[in-house]
């Protein structure tokens, strides 16, 4: 089985998107499949048209230098056209059995064009609806023209793909509501590489002293500071928690668009000396910061994006046997069972966060069970071998090939 994956971007860029891709590719290769990989022009400038990264070979698509690439909306068509051309160059060389396009729909449309030209079935994998992400990032207005055009293109891709996969039940429901046959849509859930996460990490006391956090209870967040993560809700809950737990401190590890606003909010709330912002830390040091935290908090705001899409970070926390608290948005409800694998609080509500996280900090006798249940959940349901195995039936149905290794050719 030879699969050509059509991607928005990939490693060496770091994002949830690229890490999911890397995990899928490695697991598919472990099954004996040959995987090939091309990124669109949004990958950015590359020194060459082909690149090896972390043991994976990527074909790159050069950016267009035309005037159209600088115009809103029309520049998206340039992305599709450039990727379609690149696919037409690559496909005769590698002769794939399946084109597997991943979000956004620009990649799917290019793959559909190439699939029609060469007679190859297309799988479209929806990781999020990018029109909703654009609303949160401020580049589109909900139900505005750009939003509607992006949504229409998404629906076109869903209807014309031979099969559709997606990362969670929330997205699957929305896809089916667009008129896509339910039996055409398969959930390939986000997962973790269990072997990369150890349980029982011990806090680095030297790092704790360096941060001025010795002898403190620590809650916090590790990741990118996007508005939808709701870190402002966490900060607004801190004064109430401090009244109950004076030794509480908040550790925020990472950076992003909301960094400056969050630092200012901490000052405005009078808690700047109770919140530590580390900035971005090297990937190899992230584990040390996880080991410092008593409770990880994921206060995502309630909106279409967070109600439909499951995040990866809570799964990574469970894989480490961490204690976690999260808002009750739809994406979290798919992952976290209240009182069993974590605790949930009302989204967008600092008072609910303060009450529930405060109760959790005061009930340490519950932590061992929460840790064990979370780890068991990812071991049994959210690991990559189990998730990626779901592609077997999809590929076999589209190609008529047994979903095994390269001997099928």
Model feature map: region roles:
Residues 94-98, 162, 274, 290-307, ...:
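Acidic donor-binding loop of glycosyltransferase active sites
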Residues 247, 352, 359, 366-381, ...:
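A short, well-ordered alpha-helix in the C-terminal region of glycosyltransferases
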């Amino acid at each position: 089985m030879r699969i050509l994956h059509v991607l928005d971007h990939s490693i060496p860029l770091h994002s949830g998107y690229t890490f999911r891709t890397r995990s899928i590719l490695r697991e598919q290769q472990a099954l004996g499949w040959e995987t090939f990989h091309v990124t669109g022009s949004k990958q950015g400038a590359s020194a060459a048209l082909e690149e090896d990264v972390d043991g994976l070979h990527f074909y790159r698509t050069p950016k267009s230098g035309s005037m159209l690439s600088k115009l809103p909306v029309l520049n998206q068509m340039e992305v599709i056209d450039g990727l379609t051309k690149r696919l037409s160059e690559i496909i005769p060389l590698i002769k794939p059995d399946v084109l597997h396009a991943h979000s956004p729909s620009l990649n799917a449309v290019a793959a559909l064009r190439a699939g029609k030209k060469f007679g190859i079935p297309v799988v479209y994998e929806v990781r999020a609806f990018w029109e909703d992400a654009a609303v949160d990032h401020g580049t589109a207005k909900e139900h505005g023209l750009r939003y509607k055009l992006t949504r229409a293109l998404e629906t076109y891709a869903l209807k014309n793909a031979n099969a559709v996969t997606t990362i969670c039940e929330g997205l699957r429901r929305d896809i089916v509501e667009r008129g896509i046959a339910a039996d055409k849509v398969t959930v390939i859930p986000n997962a973790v590489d269990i072997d990369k996460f150890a349980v029982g990490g011990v806090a680095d006391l030297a790092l704790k002293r360096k941060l001025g956090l010795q002898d403190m209870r620590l809650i916090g967040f590790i990741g990118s500071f996007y508005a939808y993560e709701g870190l402002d809700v966490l900060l607004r809950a801190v004064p109430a928690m401090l009244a109950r737990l004076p030794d509480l401190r908040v550790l925020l590890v990472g950076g992003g668009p909301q960094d400056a606003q969050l630092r200012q909010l901490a000052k405005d709330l009078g808690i700047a000396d109770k919140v530590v912002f580390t900035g971005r830390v090297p990937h190899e040091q992230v584990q040390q910061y996880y080991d410092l935290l008593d409770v990880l908090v994921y206060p995502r705001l309630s909106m279409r994006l967070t109600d439909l899409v499951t995040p990866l970070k809570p799964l990574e926390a469970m894989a480490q046997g961490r204690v976690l608290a999260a808002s009750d948005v739809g994406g979290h409800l798919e992952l976290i069972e209240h009182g069993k694998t974590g605790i949930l609080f009302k989204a967008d509500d600092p008072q609910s966060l303060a009450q529930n996280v405060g109760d959790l900090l005061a009930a340490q006798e519950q932590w061992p069970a929460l840790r064990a249940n979370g780890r068991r959940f990812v071991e049994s349901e959210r690991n990559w071998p189990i998730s990626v195995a779901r592609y077997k039936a999809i590929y076999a149905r589209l190609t008529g090939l047994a979903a095994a290794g390269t001997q099928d050719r």
